[in-house]
């Protein structure tokens, strides 16, 4: 494995003591991992939810996943050729964007590729993303799944949620015979349109987790050859 370049003084952005200590800790962890593992992969984890992140960490328990401020990760790798910790790492640094995670591992390349190519989890839609489906609440009694399953397999939405449906979600509901009802079908969203906060909350209220979360993997660095290889997994 190639030796690291001579240590240089790297200045991190000025911040409060606690914040600076955290940046220095992450910086040191990255440098230590670079000297420990053969490969480092760049993962893009925008919109990742905590349970999903925990699952990924568990799956790679024998490896090390480091997340931190993009700038801190870039400085640890080296933003420029003359600052890089190891040969050609500055090329990997350029690929850090958004919410970045660095996966350090000795697992072979194909194992890592196949894991992330096949890793897909259902997720609730977020605001400003495209609606995964057209969703209309049927007229009559409002059920907990909003008509996604037969009424005989569902239960009416609890009446205490009626003010939320009417005031927060702006759905024209009312209480009739102790149950939440609407007089006509209510269109929540159309497939492909951009969701606002209200629409995303309604989909979640009705248990619609029709979106998919995939980890984007742009490239990896091989310590043995000092090369960066593009992967473009889920980068479309």
UniProtKB/Swiss-Prot annotation:
Compartments reported by the entry: Nucleus, Nucleolus; Cytoplasm
Listed GO CC annotations: cytoplasm; nucleolus; nucleoplasm; nucleus; preribosome, large subunit precursor; small-subunit processome
Keyword annotations: Cytoplasm, Nucleus, Ribosome biogenesis
SUPFAM superfamilies in alphabetical order: Ribosomal protein L10-like (SSF160369)
Keyword Nucleus: yes
CDD domains per record: Ribosomal_P0_like (cd05796)
Keyword Nucleus among record annotations: yes
Record Pfam families: Ribosomal_L10, RL10P_insert
MF (Gene Ontology): large ribosomal subunit rRNA binding
Function per UniProt: Component of the ribosome assembly machinery. Nuclear paralog of the ribosomal protein P0, it binds pre-60S subunits at an early stage of assembly in the nucleolus, and is replaced by P0 in cytoplasmic pre-60S subunits and mature 80S ribosomes.
PANTHER family: MRNA TURNOVER PROTEIN 4 HOMOLOG, MRNA TURNOVER PROTEIN 4 MRTO4
Miscellaneous remark of the record: Present with 18200 molecules/cell in log phase SD medium.
Family, as annotated: Belongs to the universal ribosomal protein uL10 family.
Quaternary context: Associates with the pre-60S ribosomal particle.
Protein name per its UniProtKB record: Ribosome assembly factor MRT4
Organism taxonomic ancestry: Eukaryota, Fungi, Dikarya, Ascomycota, Saccharomycotina
């Amino acid at each position: 494995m190639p030796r690291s370049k001579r240590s240089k003084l790297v200045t991190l952005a000025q911040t409060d003591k606690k914040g600076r200590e955290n940046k220095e800790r992450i910086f040191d962890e990255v440098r230590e991992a670079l000297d420990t593992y053969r490969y480092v992969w760049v993962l893009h984890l925008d919109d990742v939810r905590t349970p999903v992140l925990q699952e990924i960490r568990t799956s790679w328990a024998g490896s090390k996943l480091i997340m931190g401020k993009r700038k801190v990760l870039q400085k640890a790798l080296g933003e420029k050729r003359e600052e890089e910790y190891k040969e050609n790492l500055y090329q990997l640094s350029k690929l850090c964007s958004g919410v970045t995670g660095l996966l350090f591992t000795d697992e072979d390349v194909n194992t890592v590729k196949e894991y992330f190519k096949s890793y897909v989890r259902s997720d609730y839609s977020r605001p400003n993303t495209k609606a995964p489906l057209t969703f209309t609440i049927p007229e009559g009694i409002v059920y907990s799944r909003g008509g996604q399953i037969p009424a005989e397999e569902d239960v009416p939405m609890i009446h205490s949620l009626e003010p939320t449906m009417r005031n927060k979600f702006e759905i024209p509901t009312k209480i009739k015979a102790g149950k939440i009802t609407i007089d006509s079908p209510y269109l929540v969203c159309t497939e492909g349109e951009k969701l606002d906060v209200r629409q995303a909350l309604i989909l979640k209220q009705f248990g619609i987790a029709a979106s998919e979360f995939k980890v984007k993997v742009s490239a990896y660095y091989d310590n043995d050859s000092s090369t960066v290889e593009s992967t473009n997994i889920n980068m479309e």
